[in-house]
Amino acid sequence: MTVTVRFAPSPTGYIHIGNTRTALSNWLFAQKNGGKFILRYDDTDVERSREEYAQAIAVDLDWLGVKPDRVEYQSKRFDVYGKAVEKLKQAGLLYACYETADELERRRKLRLARRLPPVYGREGLKLTDDEKAAFEAEGRKPHWRFLLPNFEADPFDTQRTEVHWDDLVRGPQTVDLASMSDPVLVREDGTYLYTLPSVVDDIDLGVTHIIRGDDHVTNTGVQIAIFEALGAKAPVFGHHNLLTTISGEGLSKRTGALSVGSLRDAGFEPMAVASLAILIGTSENVSAAPNMESLAERFDLASISKSSAKFDPAELDTLNRALLHEMPFSEAQLRLAAMGICGEKAEPFWRAVRGNLDRFKDAVHWWSIVDGDLPETPDPSEEDRVFLEEAFALLPPAPWDHQTWKVWTEAVKAATGRKGKNLFMPLRLALTGQAHGPELADLLVLIGPERTLTRRP
């Protein structure tokens, strides 16, 4: 058996880091088990689904390093779902209902007032052909509900009916089908809700494992019943915890908040996003994995907590810095060249500045300092100006190397009596225009004698 998983986003908005958690969990599970990863767009909601969102999802996944083995669109598979609908109708497991939303709400309130569970009472099953014809004469069209197998002989005498599965994350799980309403699978306009196409596709595409958020736990009991009604064995399920904002709110892809695209545009490294999406809310230490291979080694569904995890953007900043500070030049070289940072100075430059970067693009700022004209620098005090004039007069002759800074500052210290911050800060400001930054021993060599002299006060 080939392990086959799927990530099934609805292209009604941009994916956020919470969706990324699901996508990466499936991708890494497939990688660890020599399996296949299917990207399936759940685009049966024709009104809200957009191709632009589907394309954006593909771009986001590619940026993260997720490469689907197969791509499917549910909107192109309606004929397959139609056959499943007919099979369920023939088996007497799909029945027509004509209630309006208002009528259903009134019934729900009435059941609550009678201290009954607010589940659908299967009134549609009681309709005669004449009653159905009368509704349709009024212009009503039926929606279709799946008859849950929560009774022995009489569908109006429901019995506790437990569905069990061994969840990859949560362990043994049980749901009672008697506590649920028969789910609507087909809308009045003939379009399909999520549940049926999802099951049909999982059967048709050979999905062996379903890994998704724990907001689907209850759905799983219903879907297992539909799998069995269609004569198929249900896949293995795993339900990971959900990510929330710091304030505990759910993440919404339609708001664009924390979307993968916005994180990419903000300059975060893909492995920073992937590391946090996978490791947060687990027993693993949240630290940056340099590549997917190392993240896969740390990925373990059994380590995921059963409570929700709060996404803190500050953690993403920390991981991003850690990745940049350890990134080898071989990995950074092409990206640096694309920003105009190349030549023999590029590698020593990268080694010098990477430890001070929050974002990769910040390297451009430091390149302009070592290889360009310095922007305006703070005017030194008169005392510092005199000090700098004396210091620049003591610059060692070329050629310079990494000992030049030490030789120079020791000479300046001996001549001026300054030491510590009083010595180093005026020199840093004069050379870089910045109060903080990479080691000046590294920068001085990169700036070079000629450019250094232009920064003399």
Curated annotation (Swiss-Prot):
A GO term, aspect molecular function: ATP binding
Pfam families with a match to the protein in the record? Anticodon_2 (PF19269), tRNA-synt_1c (PF00749)
Which terms under GO biological process does the entry name?
A: glutamyl-tRNA aminoacylation
What is this enzyme's catalytic activity, as reactions? tRNA(Glu) + L-glutamate + ATP = L-glutamyl-tRNA(Glu) + AMP + diphosphate
Can you cite an annotated GO cellular component? cytoplasm
Cell compartments where the protein resides:
Cytoplasm
Q: What is its main location?
A: cytoplasm
Extent of motif 'HIGH' region: 9-19
Q: Please report, in chain numbering, the residue ranges of the motif 'KMSKS' region.
A: 250-254
Q: Which family does it belong to?
A: Belongs to the class-I aminoacyl-tRNA synthetase family. Glutamate--tRNA ligase type 1 subfamily.
PANTHER family in the cross-refs: GLUTAMATE--TRNA LIGASE, GLUTAMATE--TRNA LIGASE, MITOCHONDRIAL-RELATED
Protein name according to UniProt: Glutamate--tRNA ligase 2
Source organism of the structure? Brucella anthropi (strain ATCC 49188 / DSM 6882 / CCUG 24695 / JCM 21032 / LMG 3331 / NBRC 15819 / NCTC 12168 / Alc 37)
